[in-house]
């Protein structure tokens, strides 16, 4: 890939970064950007935000603009973002135009900045803003902010230069972002902890500008496969409006947890898992556990009674056990774990056995359970409030003591816990039960 690194002569921050890039390259060392790509430096006289159509003069597949960052609330910061104007063009570019984004490159550089930032520097995305916008080549800005002190800081310049040279984009989940501040706090945290890579992002203050045409433009300019909404930063009406537009554009809406869970799967495999979940349990939510890579999704069905009793007995233990298995579970409404699971086809037989084994072991530990041939027999003893009332026990301290398993005295009579208990027995048929013990 041919990569152009462009700075402005009048931009102290950009010159700082450029000088450190050239120094590091001259010193040798193994830098992925230099080893894997063809690098060219360009310096312009004017401000970078006014460099519309510079890609017509620069022969490159990717443009990295290296620059200073200014803010009305100055704080030491290292940022990355793509350019564009959702509305007016007060800072270069054209109104309503978005430049092509490079989400995977921004993701890679953002992660490197977080690892290399000097003490006291905040690392974040910035939402889409300013020019240039009239570009055909994917580009991004990498910036030092926010005052002359930071622009000239050699530690910041070196950190940014190293972050650029060390960039090795991986397979990412390219996303659109909606809501939040200028510094895209939630989107930054997601990107730093997952494969979620944001292209164009709209802050809360400009969310009213989003319509179906703009959303489609954002998607095309970002190569996005899904969207993320920072719901806490938007009104319910605005969030709902964006969600409907994403649906109309056939772009999945992912929550933060779904982005995290999807990060271990090939994107096509994740989509197939979601589609299969919708087929077998419409409206259900998918939770991915240790399902990774790619494969053909398949359904694993476990007896609903076994799953239900396991959840009642040890919910956290069951979910923790699932976290160690290459499986996804479904939930719907008040039913936290449906009895239908999804795994890859080549592991379906093993997963059916592993999930059954997990359930049986948890029930044998947590419940008064015995094995009777191919049946797991659960004997449950419960405090019975009606029996307590028949023994003359009023609600209050004595009631609570009996419920807690302690004998009580009332009117000269001792009432023991077993006198106010009800026993129920449930038999769960598990063919070949001895294999799961």
Swiss-Prot record:
Coiled coil: none annotated. Its EC number is 3.1.1.96. Keywords: Hydrolase, Metal-binding, Zinc. GO terms for biological process: D-amino acid catabolic process. Binds 2 Zn(2+) ions per subunit. GO terms for molecular function: D-aminoacyl-tRNA deacylase activity; zinc ion binding. The keyword Chaperone does not apply. It catalyses: a D-aminoacyl-tRNA + H2O = a tRNA + a D-alpha-amino acid + H(+); glycyl-tRNA(Ala) + H2O = tRNA(Ala) + glycine + H(+). Its cofactor is Zn(2+). InterPro entries: Deacylase_DtdA_archaea, DtdA. Belongs to the DtdA deacylase family. Monomer. D-aminoacyl-tRNA deacylase with broad substrate specificity. By recycling D-aminoacyl-tRNA to D-amino acids and free tRNA molecules, this enzyme counteracts the toxicity associated with the formation of D-aminoacyl-tRNA entities in vivo. This is D-aminoacyl-tRNA deacylase. The lineage of its organism: Archaea, Methanobacteriati, Methanobacteriota, Stenosarchaea group, Methanomicrobia.
């Amino acid at each position: 890939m041919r990569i152009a690194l462009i700075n402005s002569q009048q931009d102290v921050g950009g010159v700082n970064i450029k000088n450190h890039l050239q120094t590091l390259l001259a010193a040798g060392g193994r830098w992925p950007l230099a080893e894997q790509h063809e690098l060219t430096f360009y310096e312009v006289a004017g401000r970078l935000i006014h460099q519309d159509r510079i890609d017509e003069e620069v022969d490159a597949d990717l443009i990295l603009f290296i620059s200073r960052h200014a803010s009305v609330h100055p704080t030491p910061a290292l940022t990355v973002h793509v350019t564009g104007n959702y509305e007016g063009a007060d800072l270069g570019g054209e109104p309503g135009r978005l430049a092509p984004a490079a989400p995977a490159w921004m993701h890679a550089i953002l992660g490197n900045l977080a690892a290399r930032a000097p003490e006291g520097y905040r690392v974040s995305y910035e939402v889409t803003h300013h020019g240039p916008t009239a570009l055909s080549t994917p580009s991004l800005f990498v910036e030092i902010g926010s005052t002359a002190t930071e622009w000239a800081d050699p530690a910041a310049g070196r950190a940014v230069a190293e972050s650029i040279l060390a960039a090795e984009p991986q397979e990412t989940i390219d996303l659109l972002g909606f809501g939040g501040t200028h510094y895209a706090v939630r989107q930054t945290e997601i990107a730093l902890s997952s494969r979620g890579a944001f292209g164009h992002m709209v802050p809360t203050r400009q969310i009213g500008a989003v319509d179906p045409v703009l959303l489609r433009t954002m998607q095309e300019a970002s190569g996005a496969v899904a969207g993320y909404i920072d719901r806490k930063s938007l009104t319910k009406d605005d969030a709902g409006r964006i969600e409907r537009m994403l649906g109309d554009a056939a772009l999945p809406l992912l929550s933060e947890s779904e982005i995290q869970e999807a990060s271990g799967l090939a994107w096509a495999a994740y989509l197939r898992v979601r589609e299969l979940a919708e087929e077998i349990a419409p409206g259900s939510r998918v939770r991915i556990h240790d399902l990774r890579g790619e494969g053909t999704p398949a359904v694993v069905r476990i007896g609903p009674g076994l799953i239900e009793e396991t959840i009642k007995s040890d919910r956290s233990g069951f979910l923790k056990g699932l976290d160690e298995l290459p499986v996804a579970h479904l939930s719907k409404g008040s039913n936290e774990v449906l009895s239908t699971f999804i795994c890859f086809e080549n592991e379906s037989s093993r997963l059916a056995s592993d999930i059954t084994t997990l359930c049986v072991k948890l029930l044998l530990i947590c419940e008064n359970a015995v094995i009777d041939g191919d049946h797991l027999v659960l004997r449950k003893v419960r405090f019975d409030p009606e029996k307590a009332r028949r023994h003359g026990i009023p609600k209050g301290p004595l009631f609570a003591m009996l419920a807690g398993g302690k004998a009580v005295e009332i009117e000269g009579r001792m009432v023991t816990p077993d006198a106010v208990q009800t026993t129920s027995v449930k038999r769960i048929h598990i063919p070949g039960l001895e294999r799961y013990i």
